[in-house]
């Protein structure tokens, strides 16, 4: 359905904004803060967010899981941009599985 395509486009749109922030830094941007701090900070945040998903999954409210997965995906996209990995790379890998 058209709405499904739009929903998937959100991933590309957020990724594009993150990639643009790397090329055109914006003062006060959390994304730029992560890029400025470097790979260790980015990896730390990815790990923290993954752990928060696990903790949220133990609770009965799905909203908490949704929130934490969204945080994780954002930080994973920062990592993807930092390492030059695209959604095309990821979707091709998933399609092969």
What are these regions (language model features)?
Residues 1-6:
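Short, small-residue-biased leader/transition segments that mark boundaries at the very start
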Residues 8, 12, 37-48:
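Alpha-helix N-cap/helix-start motif at coil-to-helix transitions, marked by capping-box chemistry
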Residues 8-13, 17, 24-29:
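Phosphate/pyrophosphate- and phosphate-bearing ligand-binding catalytic cores of soluble enzymes
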Residues 17-20, 25, 34, 74:
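A charge-rich, low-complexity, intrinsically flexible signal that marks solvent-exposed coils, linkers
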Residues 26-42, 57, 61:
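Active-site flanking loop/helix segments enriched in acidic
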Residues 46-54, 62-83:
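An amphipathic alpha-helical micro-motif enriched in hydrophobic residues
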Residues 85-97:
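C-terminal end-helix/capping segment
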